[in-house]
């Protein structure tokens, strides 16, 4: 017999804000694809290469380091809101943490800037400067998103996603129509767009917080260090492909970096379907976790993994069947069926690994998840180095191997934790989402 509470869990509508955030994600994804198209029309594949590298480098570093800060801020603010307490002291604490992380990252970028300019950005120092500027744009961007989610302002959260992508595309289009054919202005468009989103949300008074009791760092997850390591490693892995091609390509193969980046974008389409599935199913799992119902948690998790696996399989089959003609239509091709299929396979395996990683974190396995992503990154480096002399194939093999290694580690960790009777933690789902730093 099913209790009323169980029935309400099964029949519960989508959680508040799902539609707003979903629309924002959709706009963010579409504008990213169009940005790559317009940028290549303006600069050509070779000229657009520094922008491709900037894109994947920025979205490895910024969400990797600051998504956990955003999610922990949101969790702490939501907890205070439930207690009818103001969250400004929490914001101040998280601002201190974000500033410290930003200072460390800034120091590293400044030290590495001559090397980055020479080896990655084709001698364009302004592109390196854009990567540094990204810090000053994305730190407040993630804090604003944390305020929005923790305060229940999901329309504002969706606006940050949509406006960020729209502003970037609008700036790129204006530059193209104006005949600008230097990478510098396009690089600045990539990293300054979040400031537009921040300004719009601030103008709507959606960044306000109220004064409240003093905040201690104990209000932040005690596992923030492991979360941060896992987030950085996971973001590095999902963005490693084009960066790996760039490192291995010679001076005559710059266009191949752009072409590979196009393929990676196309292969990530299932990841955005995953985010929609996640938005629909994870809140129900969180409610089951709050009840401490391990049996129903297992059933809900099984459903999530089946759906995610189905999306991964369909994405890989779709890439095999339709990938080359779609790439020809949108980006004038450049990749064969093997490459786009292996990229989709790697993306699909990564997606399943990500879903399991979130469950492991919900079972308080933060350290295991950090270990899994770090081992995956190590596997990528080893396999890419020794697997083949073919530029694309060695990176494709590295991505598939890395995602598979992470998946195996997470699967074994999940089985071990559940066999040991570890109870899921509702707050862990917030941490789990922080371990998913995705960007088109």
Sequence positions of predicted segments:
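Interfacial segments at transmembrane-helix termini and the short loops linking adjacent helices
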Residues: 45-49, 113-131, 254-257, 320-348
